[in-house]
Amino acid sequence: MTADLSQHTPMMQQYLGIKAEHPDQLVFYRMGDFYELFFGDAQKAARLLDITLTQRGQSAGKPIPMAGIPYHAAENYLARLVKLGESVAIAEQIGDPALAKGPVERKVVRIVTPGTVSDEALLEERRDNLLCAVFDHNNQYGCASLDLAAGRFLVTQVEGAEQLQALLERWSPAELLISEEHGLPGRWSDRPGTRKRPSWEFDEDAARRQLCQQFQVQDLAGFGEPSPVAVSAAGALLGYAKETQRGELPHITGLTVESFDDAVAMDAATRRNLELTETLDGQEQHTLAWVLDSTKTAMGARLLKRWVHQPLRNRTTLTQRQDQIDALRQGWCFESARDVLNDIGDMERILGRVALRSARPRDLTRLHASLKALPPLIGTLPAADCFCELIERIGQFPNQVELLGTAVIENPPMLIRDGGVIAPGYSEELDELRSISENAGAILVDIETRERERTQLSTLRVKYNRVHGYYIELSRRESDQAPTDYQRRQTLKNAERFITPELKEFEDKALSASSKALALEKRLYEALLEKVAADLHALQRSAAAVAELDVLASLAERAEALNWVLPQLVDDEAIIEIVDGRHPVVEQVLDDAFVPNSLHLDNARRMVIITGPNMGGKSTYMRQTALIALLAHLGSCVPAASARIGSLDRIFTRIGSSDDLAGGRSTFMVEMSETANILNNATAQSLVLMDEIGRGTSTFDGLSLAWAAAEHLARNLKSFTLFATHYFELTQLPEQLPGIYNAHLTASEHDNRIVFLHRVQEGPASRSYGLQVAQLAGVPSSVIHRAGEKLRELEQSKPLAPSATPPSSYAAPSPAAAPAQASLFNEPNAIELALTDLDPDELTPKQALEALYTLKKLT
């Protein structure tokens, strides 16, 4: 594109002017029944949407690349672009083509971005769609999150990359705003949907003024006084949201300052490893939320996911949730409530569209049905004190029910522009216009019949043509007898044509009745949205309460269906006691019965060292413990015979790793980073899961690191810890440090094949069954046979008994223990001969350690 607009046609000059204002967005330029894209936008859209790329003449001497999409199908294409992280500026024709002397006037009426969409067709029904902003100042990150469709506005501050990663993992923003002067750690800087904005948009003073103006307050103290960096992020976010919506945001009436002291903290690795809302391969099925979610409304499903990602520490809130779930289970009240919830739509997002004045007719019919269902919904709830406040928030809206019921027909068309939305009887003027438009023929017959009776003129006819409109025609013979109120309009050879005041009034109405009816209907619809919006705050409050009830009813239903129990929440005791616990997800996908297991950790037993074969169930046992603790901190029932759970401040997991290729980190580096985060941040109130620390390096390095990490957790941090390992040397820790005990997953061997019993028993495992697991994995039998030979050979070498401390003892070796330097030219000695028979790639950690003792004996 050339900067010299004079070389372009007037229409293309108009387009280029609009495009210059939206350089980072695809411009949908309305031309008749199509949205057209030009130049680079056309090429990009053709590639992303798989539509035809053509040319439209020339501009500035070069062919213009062009692609188009039908106006009526635009929503489908917008949805695809938004999912790809693209933003679209929609330029509509706002002028009358009949009156335009040059190009029809156009302007951008809305900007559709991944984080600011509110149209039903562009949103995932059961997933939050968040616009977020992050502002970095000296490693202090101000963070803001806005659910535009629901009007939910949150701010917080986190410190350091780990906390930021955890927060973004929880929020999972559809669109993320950052200052052009700052990047973000990890994958967030370059992911689709991340926008770099001018640094001045994050100015704290300007942001504070904008927020105060939005909320109509003098200062932000009433919202908990967010930190300066959080204010900067919130101001940038609010400004961007207003820019994209081309107007005010009346449903954004306040913000919530989120405190991490109120929640059980989980880092990004923990959220992934526990598979709360997504599995490790990105699926929603077979997650904790998948098991918990039997909600009836979309807004309830979204709230449930937020609860899962933010378990609470507030004992009052948790106890109330438990009481409500217990009350709903009495007499199966939850079933009655869920039957009514079936009739309630997505009030939260409908009200967001009402506030943005983008609600469609069917939104209003769904809102009407939802509000109509509130009284019977309240009637299903138990007469318990724990529901009083919730019932008050749900409320009842008889005036809105009556208004919407009389204003909109039961099954309206999709769009107001199609007409036929406003119900008969709502507006006399509209009813009259519709009657004229729909019954013009009958009205003309009625006028003709009445005029004939009045005048007694037999040749009288009421007719119409495009030139003269409606008229009364009389023969030349009878024209002299026309009444005095007949005004002559046209004289013909054999007839005279007249107009009367009544016919003139009908003509004025009939010729424009259809267009007038549609214009009036649009005005009535806009006024109707204003009337609904007058109760917006109370309606939003009701929607939030209904969503909360939906989640509680879902948790009650799940507890009954899955045989879960309410855990005892303990304030004055550090304890995790689970009797016959089950993994909530694995239990649902197993064909066989799940083997339950118990756990008891308290001040006297802070750590359990878990050993046993691969695939024996160590990771499942650890994860089920974390998930049961998390469920308790939701206020939910848990999969166990009984449970007592003390208050936790954090849940950490170090389970499994893979290379971080994008970040240039090896498996071992990822493992050590996660371990470092745990050792630096865990407290005595934390639950820590450590699985196979030290696998990614040499045997002695790994064993030493695992030993030291376990020792630090037990001796210094005193966290509740489940520590799974294949280093059998760690089973000696209980003999050296208090508060540690051993447990193992049982297995048996039959016909050289391993049978996993999945039962946890106290004490260390007797062996690792490495060859049997390899056989199950399909390792060739020849390799298994050779490994068995080597194993027997190593076992017969009678290694020295392992020492009571890890191989890499902190004590420096004595000079006498230093090995002599070997000559390069000596004949092979016994050690060298023994080494030639060893293949380190085929040894388990235990076998490698035993081989080392054998070599030591040969010195």
Swiss-Prot record:
Per the record, its GO cellular-component terms are:
cytosol
A single GO BP term for this record reads: mismatch repair
As one GO molecular function, the record gives: ATP binding
InterPro entries the record matches: DNA_mismatch_repair_MutS, DNA_mismatch_repair_MutS-lik_N, DNA_mismatch_repair_MutS/MSH, DNA_mismatch_repair_MutS_C, DNA_mismatch_repair_MutS_clamp, DNA_mismatch_repair_MutS_core, DNA_mismatch_repair_MutS_N, DNA_mismatch_repair_MutS_sf
- Cite the residue spans of the region called Disordered: 797-822
Record-listed ATP binding positions: G612, P613, N614, M615, G616, G617, K618, S619
Q: Cross-referenced Pfam families, in alphabetical order? A: MutS_I, MutS_II, MutS_III, MutS_IV, MutS_V
Query: Known PROSITE patterns for this protein?
Result: DNA_MISMATCH_REPAIR_2
Alphabetical keyword list: ATP-binding, DNA damage, DNA repair, DNA-binding, Nucleotide-binding
Domain of life the protein comes from? Bacteria
Q: What does this protein do?
A: This protein is involved in the repair of mismatches in DNA. It is possible that it carries out the mismatch recognition step. This protein has a weak ATPase activity.
Q: Which family does it belong to?
A: Belongs to the DNA mismatch repair MutS family.
NCBIfam families under this entry? mutS1, PRK05399.1
The identity of this protein, by name, is DNA mismatch repair protein MutS
Question: Source species, please?
Answer: Alcanivorax borkumensis (strain ATCC 700651 / DSM 11573 / NCIMB 13689 / SK2)
State the organism's lineage.
Bacteria, Pseudomonadati, Pseudomonadota, Gammaproteobacteria, Oceanospirillales
